[in-house]
């Protein structure tokens, strides 16, 4: 154990942490902790609330073991006392002060609000098969907040337009329902807001503020995972707003059922409508490229737009990054855009799955993403219609992209070579007539990571 003749072991720990975390984190989580008593066997600490206690143990347990006494199990020998809220002495009854209006509360509680991005509106959201449904749902709830799908839960990968739709809902409601209170916030900001009000002993004020909203927009709810106490407060706020028919829109990188949250909150999130934002298909990617290029004043011929879209397929942000890079190059060197310039400038962004790099596992992951099924189900034995089709597509892609024999491919899938052959013939017949399946297979190919 580290020792110091001039300060207690707890003070040593505090000084150590102070040099290794941000000023805000230190003031919110460490500074409020007061030492009550320190002996060779244990340390008694006063914490303002249970959240601070849990944060200390969750984030600094290993460091604590280097400074404070340990118990028989090798755990930090700490005893916590939650501070009592000191009541003010009784005062003579005075004339009642005017109650703070919801509008005043609203203005005072905007510290953590996420400003709506002026560029994120419905009219510049490029629509395609992968996002048509979720955009329609977002437009629907913006027109009738609290009366359509509540909550609206939007999930999908990074850079596919979830935040764009979230902010678009906020803009529309503010412009068409001017009397409604709108608040947009990230999950991290909600947690920081809660911590701040706990520290200031003004949690009721925060609760009143959130419960006075008509539309709550929450970005990246996945950051609520593994934060049980904060999750409980969010769930309480969530339920109150839903019961008052106030609209909630949530975004996440996963559907509710795949989040590591309590069954209670997952069930609440699945009450309304869960909508997926998928990877844009080729035509949508081309439309996005042309729209972004037009905004930048860059002329991009159709054939070059298709060339770029055929090589960049991960998400919209990558497409936007490509346009930014090409715009800068053409302006700096006074060049007109050509395929050669695109190839040289965007070499690092271009991806192309090769037969040598593609594995069965990467194919399965890609198919699971595009067909929106769980990877373990795809590897399982379920004979449901959607899983059978997804497995057949995976086998078809394996035969197309991997140089192994049918026997080896069948072995990788736990099937016989004849099953693989049947799957391939089935898919080949279907793609001649099924345009949607053809697009899905194209997306799978583009999404494969070696």
Swiss-Prot record:
InterPro entries: AAA+_ATPase, Chromosome_initiator_DnaA, Chromosome_initiator_DnaA-like, Chromosome_initiator_DnaA_CS, DnaA_C, DnaA_dom, DnaA_N_dom, DnaA_N_sf. PROSITE patterns: DNAA (PS01008). ATP binds at residues 159, 161-163. The keyword ATP-binding applies. One of its GO terms (cellular component) is plasma membrane. Residues 331-450 are annotated as: Domain IV, binds dsDNA. Pfam families: Bac_DnaA (PF00308), Bac_DnaA_C (PF08299), DnaA_N (PF11638). Residues 1-85 are annotated as: Domain I, interacts with DnaA modulators. SUPFAM superfamilies: P-loop containing nucleoside triphosphate hydrolases (SSF52540), TrpR-like (SSF48295). Residues 115-330 are annotated as: Domain III, AAA+ region. One of its GO terms (molecular function) is lipid binding. Residues 85-114 are annotated as: Domain II. Keywords: ATP-binding, Cytoplasm, DNA replication, DNA-binding, Lipid-binding, Nucleotide-binding. Belongs to the DnaA family. Plays an essential role in the initiation and regulation of chromosomal replication. ATP-DnaA binds to the origin of replication (oriC) to initiate formation of the DNA replication initiation complex once per cell cycle. Binds the DnaA box (a 9 base pair repeat at the origin) and separates the double-stranded (ds)DNA. Forms a right-handed helical filament on oriC DNA; dsDNA binds to the exterior of the filament while single-stranded (ss)DNA is stabiized in the filament's interior. Domain I is involved in oligomerization and binding regulators, domain II is flexibile and of varying length in different bacteria, domain III forms the AAA+ region, while domain IV binds dsDNA. This is Chromosomal replication initiator protein DnaA 1. The gene is dnaA1.
């Amino acid at each position: 154990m580290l020792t110091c003749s001039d300060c207690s072991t707890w003070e040593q720990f505090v000084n150590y942490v102070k040099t290794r975390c941000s000023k805000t984190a230190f003031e919110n989580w460490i500074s409020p902790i007061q030492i009550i008593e320190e002996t060779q066997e244990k340390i008694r600490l006063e914490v303002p609330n249970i959240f601070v206690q849990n944060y200390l143990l969750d984030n600094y347990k290993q460091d604590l073991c280097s400074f404070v006494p340990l118990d028989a199990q090798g755990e930090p020998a700490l005893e916590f006392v939650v501070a009592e809220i000191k009541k003010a002495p009784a005062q003579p009854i005075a004339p009642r002060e005017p109650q703070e209006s919801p509008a005043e509360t609203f203005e005072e509680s905007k510290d953590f609000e996420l400003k709506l991005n002026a560029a994120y509106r419905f009219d510049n959201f490029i629509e395609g098969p992968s996002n048509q449904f979720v955009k329609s749902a977002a437009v629907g709830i913006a027109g009738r907040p609290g009366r359509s799908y509540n909550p609206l839960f939007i999930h999908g990968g990074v850079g596919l337009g979830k935040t764009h739709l979230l902010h678009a809902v906020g803009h529309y409601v503010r412009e068409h329902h001017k009397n409604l209170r709108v608040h947009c916030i990230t999950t991290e900001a909600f947690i920081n807001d809660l911590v701040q009000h706990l520290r200031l002993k003004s949690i009721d004020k925060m609760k009143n503020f959130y419960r006075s909203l008509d539309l709550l927009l929450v970005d990246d709810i996945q950051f609520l995972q593994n934060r049980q106490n904060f999750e409980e407060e969010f769930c309480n706020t969530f339920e109150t707003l839903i019961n008052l028919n106030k609209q909630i829109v949530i975004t996440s990188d996963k559907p509710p059922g795949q989040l590591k949250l309590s069954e209670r909150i997952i069930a609440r999130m699945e009450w309304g409508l869960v909508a997926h934002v998928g990877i844009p298909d080729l035509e949508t990617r081309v439309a996005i490229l042309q729209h972004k290029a037009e905004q930048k004043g860059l002329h991009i011929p159709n054939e070059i737009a298709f060339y770029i879209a055929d090589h960049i397929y991960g998400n919209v942000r990558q497409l936007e990054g490509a346009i930014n890079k090409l715009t800068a190059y053409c302006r700096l060197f006074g060049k007109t855009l050509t395929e050669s310039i695109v190839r040289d400038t965007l070499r690092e962004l271009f991806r192309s799955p090769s037969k040598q790099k593609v594995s069965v596992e990467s194919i399965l992951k890609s198919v699971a993403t595009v067909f929106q099924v769980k990877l373990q189900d795809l590897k399982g034995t379920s004979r449901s219609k959607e899983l059978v089709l997804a497995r057949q597509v995976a086998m078809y892609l394996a035969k197309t992209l991997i140089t192994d024999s049918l026997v080896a491919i069948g072995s990788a899938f736990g099937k016989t070579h004849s099953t693989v052959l049947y799957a391939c013939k089935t898919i080949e017949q279907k793609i001649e007539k099924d345009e949607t399946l053809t697009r899905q297979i194209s997306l799978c190919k583009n999404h494969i990571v070696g």
